[in-house]
Design a protein with these regions (language model features):
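Extended C-terminal regions of large enzymes
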Residues: 22-60, 66-458
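Well-ordered mid-protein domain cores that form the structural environment of catalytic cofactors
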Residues: 1-30, 35
């Protein structure tokens, strides 16, 4: 382990920091570089950690943890290989999984348009949060859809190391950097969550404006989902008079990038108490306010919502997710699968589905399996893959281990003071139509009640 003085890099953006670290580290191709931007350096609780430029430890403030330790970044290098006990069997299974991923339609969505393919289908069923969820469909959805990004700005596709899919979609952002028509291109990765948070949530009407906001958010090292949701809240709060221009220091209007670009920089480097407070997240900012701003603050379980407004399972799943992630139990997917039976839907059924999915996904997250590839790696395939490494488990044993892991996480969360009743859902969730019509608070509360009872028995 080698330590380097990072004082000269401390307030640099993510890209420039990465360039310096790459030049210092050597060994191209055999390393991973993670680093923070100014947001983490300034201990902003919504700061993230950038991982190899296009990926992130994105949520829950990991960037601020790095900053609190005076740690600008890490470069991990290594060349060690692992011995495979049965190479022929390993190679056979590898080829089978590779073909399953590349020669079937299981991963086609992620390679072709990527997750922004969700934009138009969600918009069609009134499930795309827009204008701080004043609307659940967006009149400019076709202008910021996956199709629009692919046709207008997609420059290349990138994969995580060892993966053949290329799900990371990188757009080309044309940037003016000096007078005399001096331009440069920046590669900016985009996905559905960012197209929501820095697109429909704040009223952007074209792909370039969305990329511009994403690029600024990436450079300063903020959680892009939280950042966009906070910006949408601030815009509405200004209109309502719950905050003033003396707080925001800039005018914020849906669809106008200039104010948002400045506000993003202020969130990362807070110039006043307002930005210091709201940078802690909407739950912390609104819970002590008497101005009614909690009623339109879009958080679930204390964390800003993801880009779906599919129904009650997404709301309940967002509150209960063990990692505070919409991907813990995919409530948004449960909503869509159960929509055809909406009239007969029971709260207990939804709670059971949430827990069932949480257990299965805990298998994948514990084994560091990409959740995009969950249909490639069914539990039988996971067991065969482990066996190729001389680790022998059955699907039932994996689920039993996952349940134990989930139980330990729940116990830890309880010891740290987390209680479902401390995170009431904002009124906005029950005012805006979803695919289920207006969601009833009583029904969502009933789901959470059943969840609390059922989770004790996992």
């Amino acid at each position: 382990i080698i330590f380097h003085d990072a004082e000269a890099l401390w307030q640099l953006g993510v890209s420039e920091s990465g360039q310096f670290m790459r030049s210092m580290a050597g060994a191209p191709g055999n390393r991973s570089i993670i680093r923070i931007g100014p947001a983490g350096a300034n201990l902003v609780p919504t700061a993230c950690i950038n991982v190899d430029t296009y990926r992130h430890f994105g949520r829950l403030g990991a960037g601020a943890v790095f900053g609190s330790k005076n740690l600008k970044g890490l470069v991990i290098c290594g060349e060690k290989d692992f011995d495979i006990k049965n190479p022929p069997e390993y190679n056979k299974l590898y080829s089978e999984i590779y073909d399953k991923a590349t020669k079937t339609n299981l991963m086609a969505k992620y390679h072709e348009l990527g997750t922004p393919k969700n934009v138009l289908p969600l918009n069609k069923i009134n499930a795309l949060p827009s204008y701080n969820l004043k609307q659940s469909n967006y009149e400019y959805a076709d202008k910021i859809s996956g199709e629009a990004f692919a046709e207008e700005v997609l420059a290349r596709k990138v994969s995580c190391s060892g993966c053949p899919i290329g799900c990371v979609h990188v757009g080309g952002l044309r940037k003016l950097f000096d007078a005399g028509y001096e331009y440069e291109y920046a590669g900016v990765s985009y996905d559905h969550e960012l197209v929501f948070s820095l697109g429909s949530q704040v009223g952007m009407k074209n792909t370039s404006d969305v990329l511009n906001l994403i690029n600024e958010t990436e450079e300063v090292g903020l959680d892009a989902i939280s950042c966009g949701v906070i910006l949408g809240f601030m815009t509405e709060a200004l209109v309502r008079g719950d905050i003033k221009i003396t707080d925001t220091l800039v005018e914020l209007n849906f669809g106008e990038t200039a104010g948002y670009l400045a506000a993003i920089r202020h969130l990362a480097s807070p110039p006043n108490d307002f930005y210091r407070e709201i940078g802690r997240g909407l739950y912390n900012y609104t819970r002590k306010k008497a101005d009614g701003s909690h009623d339109y603050a879009l958080h679930l379980g204390g964390l800003e919502m993801a880009g779906y407004f599919t129904g009650p399972a997404h709301l309940a799943g967002g509150v209960t997710g063990i990692r505070h992630s919409h991907l813990d139990n995919a409530g948004y997917s449960i909503d869509q699968k159960l929509l055809k039976d909406a009239a007969q839907l029971s709260a207990k059924t939804v709670a059971e589905k949430i827990i069932e999915e949480e257990v299965i996904r805990s298998v994948y997250t514990s084994l560091v399996i990409c959740l995009f590839a969950r249909e490639v790696y069914d539990l039988e395939t996971v067991c065969r893959a482990l066996a190729a490494l001389d680790i022998h488990k059955t699907p039932d044993e994996l689920k039993a281990a996952s349940s134990k892991i989930l139980k330990v996480k729940l116990e830890l969360r309880e010891k740290m003071g987390f209680k479902l009743e401390n995170f009431p859902l904002s009124e906005r969730y029950f005012e805006t139509p979803s695919p289920y019509g207006l969601i009833k608070r009583e029904f969502t509360d009933e789901i959470l009640k059943h969840y609390g009872e059922l989770i004790k028995n996992i």
